[in-house]
Each structure stands twice: as C-alpha cells, then as structure tokens.
Regions:
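Conserved phosphate- and dinucleotide-binding cores of soluble alpha/beta proteins
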Residues: 2-8, 84-237
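Short, surface-exposed, charge-dense and proline/glycine-enriched linear segments
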Residues: 79-86, 106-108, 139-141, 256-271
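Intrinsically disordered, low-complexity segments enriched in Ser/Pro/Gly/Ala and basic residues
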Residues: 1, 12-15
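Short secondary-structure junctions and interdomain/linker hinges
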Residues: 41, 45, 49, 224-228, ...
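Alpha-helix initiation and N-capping motif
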Residues: 59, 211-214, 242
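N-terminal active-site beta-alpha-beta segment that forms phosphate/nucleotide-binding
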Residues: 6, 14-93, 101
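A conserved C-terminal secondary-structure "cap"
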Residues: 229-271
Length: 271
C-alpha cells in the first residue's frame, strides 16, 4: 500500500471561517481526496443530471460536494430512501439513460485495462472460474448510453489495472458504426488520475497523488499509458472542500452510507 492509500494525519473536524479558501494541510483522508478529484472532473464538463449506482459512497460524496458548492445538478442516487426520484429501482435508471437524460455515471471493475474495458465477471475460464466478481449489472448499457463515465477504483495495482481484462463486461471503445453515446472521461484511483482518449483508445496520466512518483505509478499499472506534458501532483483538497465534505455532504449521506460516514468523517447517524 502506498502513502497515497494511508490515512492522513487527523485534523480538526472543520476549518476556521477565515481560512476556507486556503489549501488544506495533510489533514485529510484518501477517500476525501478522491471525492474532491471526482468533483473537479464533474465540474470540468457542463452537466445537468448525474446518476450514482449502489455501493458508491465516494462518487456520491463527490456529487454532493458539487451540489453544496452551488452546481445546479440533478442527482439520482440508487437506494437513497429520501429524495430519490426512482420508485422502481434500476428499471427507471435504464429508461432515463436510454432516453439520453443521464449525463454522467460512474463505473468500476474487478479489472480495468488500458482501453478502458471493464471486467465485472471474474478471471479464469468458464465455468470453473478462478475468481468471480459481482457481475455486470447493466454496466455495458450504462457505459454506451451515458454521455460520459468516470471510472473509479481505489485499489491501484497490477492485478486490477491489467494489460487486457480476462472478460469484457463493458467495452471502453467500439468498432466504427456501433452506436454509443459516450465514453470514459477519466479513471480515478488511490494513486493518480488518468484521462481517457477514446479516439486513440489510451489513458494518459493527468496527476499523481502525494507520496507517489511516475516510477511508482508505472510499477503498479499493468497497462501502458501516455504521460501528459504538464502532469504534476494532484492538488490537495482545500479547507472549504473538506469543511463541506465533513459537514453538509456527510449530512446528506448518513442515511445511505452510515458506515462510510463513521469511518471517513467520524460521524454516526443519530439513533
């Protein structure tokens, strides 16, 4: 595990109002850094409607951070008991996406390769597979029909970021003539941020998290990637961003992700 995966030194629960716009010191957790990275990617492209799937607390935190910063976003979060526009679960999510009414979605994978292909099936040959992953759950449909997708995986290792996935649940690029509405925008990991370029089917390294180097990223990545001319260290969360994450964002997430809020933000849902 790299320094970027370690717990940052714990700081106060909220910054003073006089310092809200100053960059934060090293008093943040990796999960907070990744939520901020995703939020910045969200704001980089005009967006109206974002959908967040199940068991996705860090992308959900990123979306709520954008909202609390004033972005006029519509959020659709599966399994949220209050404020959820869906009454029929994922069926309505797929309907909206097929109609072109979802601008952004998030996907991960047990394996992700250099062409942004995702493997949510497992490794080894069917039926006696070596490892079984949770399953595709409509990921290919969402990947094809959403305007853009941010890929996300906390673990950054050669067993996850591979040269070629063992099975393709959702392809990152398609043959000419195959209709798809969008592609991956980026891949955020516990070590760095990659941007994806569908026209050439490759990732480029965009920024490196504190404690990592280009050499360490190459050593822990199973696929080849380009390096942007201006690649540098991933900017740390500002005190304003941390204050929102630990306050207003956590308030929105306590019901759906109580364990995540307790572990990351140190807050528990009232009995």
């Amino acid at each position: 595990m790299s320094a970027a995966d370690d717990l940052r030194a714990q700081g106060p629960s909220g910054p003073s109002t006089e310092k809200l716009n100053r960059p934060a010191p090293a008093s943040y957790r990796t999960e907070e850094l990744l939520a901020v990275c995703i939020a910045r990617l969200i704001r980089a492209v005009p967006t109206s409607h974002i959908a967040v799937g199940a068991a996705s607390p860090i992308p959900a935190a990123a979306c709520w951070l954008c909202v609390k910063q004033g972005a006029p976003l519509r959020l659709s979060l599966l399994h949220k008991r209050t404020g959820n526009p869906f009454t029929d679960g994922s069926r309505e999510l797929f309907d909206l996406t097929g109609q072109g009414r979802v601008d952004l979605f998030f996907l991960g994978g047990g394996e992700i390769d250099g062409q942004a292909n995702l493997n949510l099936i497992g490794t080894g040959d069917w039926p006696g597979m070596e490892v079984r992953f949770p399953g595709s759950f409509g990921s290919a449909f969402m990947y094809f029909m959403t305007g853009r997708t941010i890929l996300f995986r906390e673990e950054h290792s050669p067993r996850v970021l591979v040269d070629r996935v063992a099975h393709i649940s959702a392809p990152g690029i398609s043959e000419p003539g195959v209709y798809r509405r969008g592609h991956a925008q980026a891949l955020v990991t516990g070590r760095c941020v990659f941007h994806f370029h569908p026209e050439r089917g490759r990732f480029s390294l965009a920024s490196i998290h504190a404690g990592e180097t280009l050499e360490s990223i190459r050593a822990m990545t199973g696929f080849d990637f380009d390096v942007a001319d201006d690649v540098g260290e991933t900017p740390a969360p500002t005190e304003e961003e941390l204050a929102l994450l630990r306050g207003a964002v956590c308030d929105e997430m306590l019901e759906t992700y109580p364990d995540f809020c307790a572990r990351v933000f140190g807050r528990k849902r009232a009995a």
